[in-house]
Regions:
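HhH-family (HhH-GPD) DNA N-glycosylase catalytic core used in base-excision repair
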Residues: 1-209
Length: 209
């Protein structure tokens, strides 16, 4: 990771601005997928409240309900959520039961295969796929593909001719970390870093992108 900063002065500046900073990982791809659904088209504080209520009312030991339990709670009418979130969480639960949403499984296959598998889950799109692969499997070298604000930050820092694919070559094998550092820097300028730290919630992109 220090070698990435040695190759790229912009990443070196991001490292210096956030010493010791690392991507905030979820316990599992299943939990990351649940968060992706809960935060879809929803402000982060509201999504965080939905997650807390889901854990408090239906989880055990401070954890989200197990996939089979989550599916049963939804289909029995014990758990109601806005919009299509219940439908999407059922699909996430089914995928977890089928073994798709496990860290070892997603890390064992090529990235393209993992993306294809995740995109078969109803309610999981490209943005959520990035989230699950980076924060759910804690992969260090997955480059986000649906982060428009990352693209804007790259343009801001590297110039109008720079692209995500070209500048990220110098970030290997820590493209995930570098991308999250740049996004965190942007969030800091926009004032959300302080809010997330104060609330104890993970720093995640605004889902209204």
């Amino acid at each position: 990771w220090p070698a990435v900063g040695a190759r790229d002065p912009i990443i070196a500046a991001a490292q210096a601005a956030l010493p010791g900073f690392r991507p905030c990982g979820f316990h599992s791809p299943y939990e990351a997928a649940c968060w992706a659904v809960l935060s879809q088209r929803t402000r982060v504080p509201i999504a965080a409240q939905l997650r807390r209520e889901l854990i408090t009312n239906h989880g055990t030991g401070g954890m989200l309900p197990a996939p089979k339990t989550l599916h049963q709670k939804i289909t029995s009418g014990q758990l109601e959520l806005p919009g299509r979130k219940a439908e999407y969480l059922c699909a996430v639960a089914d995928a977890a039961v089928d073994g798709i949403l496990t860290g070892p499984q997603l890390r064992a296959v090529p990235e393209e295969t993992a993306r294809e598998q995740l995109l078969t889950i109803t309610g999981i799109g490209p943005f959520a796929t990035d989230l699950i692969l980076i924060r759910g499997t804690n992969a260090t070298d997955i480059l986000p593909r649906a982060e428009r604000r990352l693209d804007h930050e790259i343009t801001h820092l590297y110039g109008p001719e720079a692209t995500r694919d070209t500048v990220s070559e110098a970030w290997r094998p820590f493209r995930s970390w570098a991308a999250v550092h740049l996004r965190a820097g942007r969030e800091g300028r926009e004032g959300r870093m302080h809010d997330c730290l104060q609330s104890g919630q993970p720093l995640v992109p605004d889902r209204r992108l």
